[in-house]
Design a protein with these regions (language model features):
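Sec/Tat signal peptide C-region and signal peptidase I cleavage site
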Residues: 17-23
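Sec-dependent N-terminal signal peptides
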Residues: 6-15
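A short beta-strand-turn-helix
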Residues: 25-41
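Structural micro-motif
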Residues: 89-98
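Short active-site neighborhood of thiol/selenol oxidoreductases, capturing the structured segment around
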Residues: 38-50
Length: 126
């Protein structure tokens, strides 16, 4: 009986942790970023952590945006594993979304996960 309870606890822990995991991978490189800037493209950068609930919500919205805005460059990176990128972009916190149009930063959100707010921030860069 004790073993059964332990297995249930382990299973519950694994399932609940997995449901918050971010299914996003780092695709940010300086080369891609600099090329998109020099071409005057709209760029959306997302800083996340795999375990972060808000990040998971943001990723879902950003995936929708990426499907809708096919001419925008979407870049992401895991903050704790790529602090150099955070320093380059002056991003201190995960859950940060920054929108550029070429060289110019057009909007910055921290901790915002509502679709309307994220889409409005992206539209400022178009």
């Amino acid at each position: 009986m004790v073993m059964k309870k332990i297995l249930i606890i382990i299973l519950f822990t694994l399932l609940s942790t997995n449901s918050y995991g971010v299914e996003k991978k780092t695709n940010f490189t300086k080369e891609i970023f600099n090329k998109a800037k020099s071409e005057g493209k709209t760029i959306v950068i997302n800083s996340y952590e795999e375990w972060c609930y808000t990040c998971t919500k943001q990723v879902k919205v950003l995936n929708e945006a990426e499907a809708k805005f096919t001419d925008i460059v979407f870049l992401s990176y895991e903050q704790s594993k790529h602090e150099d990128i955070g320093k380059l972009l002056n991003i201190e916190f995960w859950t940060t979304i920054v929108v550029y149009k070429g060289d110019e930063e057009k909007s910055r959100l921290i901790g915002v996960a509502k679709k309307k707010d994220i889409f409005n921030a992206i539209l400022k860069g178009i």
